[in-house]
Amino acid sequence: MKLDGYTRLAAVVANPIKHSISPFIHNRAFEATATNGAYVAWEIEASDLAETVANIRRYQMFGINLSMPYKEQVIPYLDKLSDEARLIGAVNTVVNENGNLIGYNTDGKGFFKCLPSFTISGKKMTLLGAGGAAKSILAQAILDGVSQISVFVRSVSMEKTRPYLDKLQEQTGFKVDLYALENVSELQARIVESDLLVNATSVGMDGQSSPVPESINLPETILVADIIYQPFETPFLKWARSQGKPAVNGLGMLLYQAAEAFQLWTGKEMPTEEIWQSLTEKYQ
C-alpha cells in the first residue's frame, strides 16, 4: 500500500471496534483497484463523535462507516440522509461529497446482494428479530418491492417493536405483520408461504441454539439466510440444509455492505470475488 501526501482516509467508528474486519476488506479493495486510500478503525467515546464527524470535512476524507453505538447518534451531525437511512433511522456509511456529509445505510442492500440468484421484488419474507440489522433488511425489502413481510419477535419485545412498524407503514404505506416467536403454529403457517426466511437475531452465535424449533417444516422453494457468520454454520443453517434447502450465512452481507460503501466513496466497484476468497479462508 502506497501512502503519500495524496492518500485519502476512510475509517470505521464504533466502540468497541478493534476486532473489526472492515479494515481488512477496504484496504484490500483500495489496493486491488489502485485507489490511493487507507482505511483505519477508530474506537471513540460518545463525547468525541461530533469532533470525529467534523474531521471528515477537515481532512477531506472519503467518509466513515459506523457501527454500534453510533449509527443513530451520528444523524444530527449530517447534512442529508438517503431514503433507506431515513426509513431505518440509522446510518452505517457517511459519504463526503465536496464537504456535504450524506448518511446512507448499506446493510440492507448488502444483505440482498449476497443472496444467490434471488430478488425480493414480489416475494414473501419471514423475518426473525427486529433489531438494527432486521430494520435495515425490512426497509430495503420494502424499497425493493417485497409483497409481504411477517416479523417474529419474542412476546416481551412485541410492544417495543410495534411503533417502528407503524412508523414504517406511515412512511411507505406498507403494512408489516407482527407475531410472537413463541406462536409456533403461526410461525409454521407464515414460513410455508414464504420465499425467504431470515434469522436477524443473535440466537445461534453460541453454536448451540436456534431461533426456531426443529419441528418446523420448510416449503419446497425457500431460501434461508442467517446474518451471523461466526460460527460459519449456525444450528439454524444446519437445520435448513438438513431439509435440503439453500442456506447462506452473514459473511456475504458483511462483504456486500462494504462494497456498497466503497462504491459510494470511490465510484469504483469492489472486487468482491477476490476478497470473498480471502474472507472465507479466514472464517471457515
From Swiss-Prot:
CDD domains: NAD_bind_Shikimate_DH. Shikimate binds at residues 20-22, 67, 92, 107, 229. Keywords: Amino-acid biosynthesis, Aromatic amino acid biosynthesis, NADP, Oxidoreductase. InterPro entries: Aminoacid_DH-like_N_sf, NAD(P)-bd_dom_sf, SDH_C, Shikimate_DH, Shikimate_DH-bd_N, Shikimate_DH_fam. Pathway: Metabolic intermediate biosynthesis; chorismate biosynthesis; chorismate from D-erythrose 4-phosphate and phosphoenolpyruvate: step 4/7. The active site is at 71 (proton acceptor). Belongs to the shikimate dehydrogenase family. This is Shikimate dehydrogenase (NADP(+)). It comes from Streptococcus pneumoniae (strain ATCC 700669 / Spain 23F-1). The lineage of its organism: Bacteria, Bacillati, Bacillota, Bacilli, Lactobacillales. The gene is aroE.
